[in-house]
From Swiss-Prot:
Originating organism: Methanospirillum hungatei JF-1 (strain ATCC 27890 / DSM 864 / NBRC 100397 / JF-1)
Keyword Protein biosynthesis attached: yes
Record-listed ATP binding positions: 263-265, 279, 350-353
Keywords: Aminoacyl-tRNA synthetase, ATP-binding, Cytoplasm, Ligase, Nucleotide-binding, Protein biosynthesis
Record family assignment: Belongs to the class-II aminoacyl-tRNA synthetase family. Type-1 seryl-tRNA synthetase subfamily.
Binding residues for L-serine: 232-234, 286, 387
HAMAP family named in the record: Ser_tRNA_synth_type1 (MF_00176)
Name this polypeptide is given: Serine--tRNA ligase
Length: 425
């Protein structure tokens, strides 16, 4: 969320950002937020003064009595102080809830390079890599390839677990594991520490990491424990250092999270209804970085380049798009998507999301860095995240781009050492 001090100093900048996002409903929130903030600070001052008076009035009463003076007015004042303090505290609590409600939902400040647009049709292409292959035979979609070769069983998974699940079998299990290890090896060479996070996260932490209004509908909730199965390892990694202070020398901290991801709402998109692209459960390697604010825009490009390197080495054609103001969501200040070429649909589809969240998560989570020149000075860190590989989507891209007329699939050269040097699935 935004720091209330930033809101006080920059209300016009926030209003302009909301207009770029076409989020007109929240414009009125800014005025009310500032009014509530002023009242809240007034109440703090008044309540502190009442507490000081409560502590000192006993002395005044005793002094009056010793002097033979009438202390009835002081006694009456003292009797009323607890009630006045309680009233102020109750009002402060209500105002605090309202302020937090606003701050948790007003989106991050956009970077100046984010294109203005209404929706995903106005995202801006940044670059393309590779040339889509020309096929001389009728293409199969990845789900058909997997079923025909007994690499996956969608029908039995539907019986056991419902739509959107799958059994991976044989070669696709090995391909999934190869993609995980391949991407981890690339990141480890670049100084990223592998992390296997908890697969559940409690509600308090989730509320600090993301906007639950947007995200809760896609998550599996464990009711008895007020916890959730994680939708991405980004979330537990972001909450990992909540309420802690980094030393500047320890940043940037680069993490590579490996986990299954669980998502309830998957939607449908033409040929996705049976297959690996939109599913309730998949494996993902996620890049996550805590860094000093001065470094975050350089690191944002680093994360994108890391993800691009993975798809380049897999020899999958892709494009990079800069996500526009109407499609970027609440948390990110800037976001790239990498979209891989899917020949069966004859279009690019998202396989990587790469975001700089600046201080938005860190303010909620109270994660700061101490200034190396001034021990008492601290500021909020920046957090960044990017997909390295979502294996189900990468497998779809490999199956469709590398399929052969006989139904076999060429294994990317970089994955062969992880698959007993086999050339074909």
């Amino acid at each position: 969320m935004l720091d209330i001090r930033f809101v006080r100093a920059n209300p016009d900048a926030i209003r302009e950002d909301l207009k770029k996002r076409n989020d007109m409903e929240k414009l009125a929130w800014i005025d009310d937020l500032l009014v509530q903030d002023i009242r809240h600070r007034e109440l703090i001052g008044q309540t502190n003064e009442l507490r000081r008076r409560r502590n000192s009035i006993s002395y005044d009463i005793n002094r009056a009595k010793k002097a033979g003076e009438d202390a009835s007015a002081l006694i009456a004042e003292a009797a009323g102080l607890p009630g006045r303090i309680k009233e102020n505290e109750a009002e402060m609590e209500e105002i605090s809830k309202k302020i937090r409600y606003y701050l948790m939902r007003i989106p991050n400040i956009l970077h100046e390079s984010v294109p203005v647009g209404a929706d995903d049709t106005q995202n801006v292409e940044v670059k393309r890599y590779g040339t889509p292959r020309t096929f001389t035979f009728e293409l199969k979609n990845h789900g058909q390839l997997a079923a025909d070769n007994d690499w996956a069983d969608f029908e039995r998974a539907t019986k056991t677990s419902g739509a959107g699940f799958y059994f991976l079998k044989g070669n696709l299990v090995l391909l999934d594991l190869a993609l995980q290890r391949f991407s981890l090896d690339i990141l480890m060479e670049k100084g990223y520490t592998p992390i296997i996070p908890p697969y559940m996260i409690n509600r308090k932490s989730y509320e600090e990491v993301t906007d639950l209004d947007d995200f809760e509908k896609v998550m599996y909730k464990i009711e008895d424990d007020d916890a959730y199965l994680i939708a991405t390892s980004e979330h537990p990694m972001a909450a990992m250092y909540q309420d802690e202070i980094f030393e500047e020398k320890d940043l940037p901290l680069r993490l590579a999270g490996l986990s299954p991801c669980f998502r309830r709402e998957i939607g449908s998109h033409g040929l996705d209804t049976k297959g690996l692209f939109r599913v309730h459960q998949f494996h993902k390697v996620e890049q996550f970085v805590y860094c000093h604010p001065d470094d975050s825009w350089t690191i944002h490009e680093e994360l994108r380049e890391n993800a691009e390197e993975i798809f380049q080495k897999l020899e999958i054609p892709y494009r990079v798009v800069n996500i526009c103001t109407g499609d970027i969501g609440t948390v990110a200040a800037k976001k790239y998507d990498i979209e891989a070429w899917m020949p069966r649909e004859n279009e690019y589809r998202e396989v990587v999301s790469c975001s700089n969240c600046t201080t938005y998560q860190a303010v909620r989570l109270n994660i700061r860095v101490r200034d190396k020149e001034d021990f008492e000075s601290k500021q909020f860190v920046h957090t960044l995240n990017s997909t390295a590989i979502a294996t189900s989507r990468a497998m779809r891209a490999i199956l469709e781009n590398n399929q052969q007329e006989d139904g076999s699939v060429v294994i990317p050269k970089v994955l062969r050492p992880y698959m007993n040097d086999k050339e074909f699935l």
